[in-house]
């Protein structure tokens, strides 16, 4: 998500100064790389701590992890179906957990204490390159699911119920990743900017309601992304009616 052969035009949408590392002909977005791995590390620690001494009657962190597992399982099963959802549960669960912890980490972790030569750390999902990369992964998963299940018959859905739908179906394939990526990016970036401005202007209790609303919105965005991912995969797997 952070490794690019050249700086993408999407990077122009970012706000402020940014840190890039050049490795040969590749450009590595330093802020996204660092914040992503910090958050992945936190997630791994939480998972290992919650599954270290598992009990028959779950308590504490184990209970929370089992709740999340059941929640993600229900999303996958409802949208993909009983027959195929298990194959896609790790993919959908990984996306949901990464987006969720990225969104909340961007709001709760005091990133400013980590000083960088340029820019500052923040939520990886507030960077357009991250959200576009995840949206493209979802598109690839959709095509893989359809082609692996139906072969070339997968492309019949582009001319159903009538061939006149072909151009509209093609346009739809481009709008899916665009809507996924820009919805997540726009909401998280707007939340970070709003909180940042309020903290700068009124640094006491006024920003707190906005931060709480931002946490709620961040959780909803993770849910929307995971649900749409499962829906698209289910759409690719099932026969058109």
UniProtKB/Swiss-Prot annotation:
Membrane topology reported for the UniProt record: Multi-pass membrane protein
GO annotation, cellular component aspect: plasma membrane-derived thylakoid membrane; proton-transporting ATP synthase complex
SUPFAM superfamilies for this protein: F1F0 ATP synthase subunit A
Localization of this protein: Cellular thylakoid membrane
Pfam families in the record: ATP-synt_A
Cited CDD domains: ATP-synt_Fo_a_6
Keywords annotated in UniProt: ATP synthesis, CF(0), Hydrogen ion transport, Ion transport, Membrane, Thylakoid, Transmembrane, Transmembrane helix, Transport
Record NCBIfam families: ATP_synt_6_or_A (TIGR01131)
Subunit structure: F-type ATPases have 2 components, CF(1) - the catalytic core - and CF(0) - the membrane proton channel. CF(1) has five subunits: alpha(3), beta(3), gamma(1), delta(1), epsilon(1). CF(0) has four main subunits: a, b, b' and c.
Protein purpose: Key component of the proton channel; it plays a direct role in the translocation of protons across the membrane.
Name listed for the protein in its UniProt record: ATP synthase subunit a
Species of origin: Parasynechococcus marenigrum (strain WH8102)
């Amino acid at each position: 998500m952070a490794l690019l052969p050249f700086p993408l035009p999407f990077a122009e949408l970012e706000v402020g100064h940014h840190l890039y590392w050049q490795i040969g002909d590749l450009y590595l977005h330093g802020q996204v790389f660092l914040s992503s791995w910090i958050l992945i590390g936190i997630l791994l620690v939480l998972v290992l701590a919650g599954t270290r001494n598992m009990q028959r009657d779950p308590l504490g962190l184990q209970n929370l992890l089992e709740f999340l597992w059941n929640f993600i399982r229900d999303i996958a099963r409802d949208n993909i179906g009983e027959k195929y959802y298990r194959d896609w549960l790790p993919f959908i669960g990984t996306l949901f957990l990464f987006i969720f912890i990225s969104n909340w980490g961007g709001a709760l972790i005091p990133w400013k204490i980590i000083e960088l030569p340029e820019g500052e750390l923040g939520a990886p999902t507030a960077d357009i390159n991250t959200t576009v990369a995840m949206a493209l992964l979802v598109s690839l998963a959709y095509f893989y699911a359809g082609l692996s299940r139906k072969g070339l018959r997968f492309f019949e859905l582009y001319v159903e119920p009538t061939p006149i739908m072909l151009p509209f179906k093609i346009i739809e394939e481009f709008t899916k990743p665009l809507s996924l990526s820009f919805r997540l990016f726009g909401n998280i970036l707007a939340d970070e900017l709003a909180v940042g401005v309020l903290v700068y202007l009124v640094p006491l209790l006024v920003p707190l309601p906005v931060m709480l609303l931002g946490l709620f919105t961040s959780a909803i965005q993770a849910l929307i992304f995971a649900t749409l991912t499962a829906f698209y995969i289910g759409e690719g797997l099932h026969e058109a009616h």
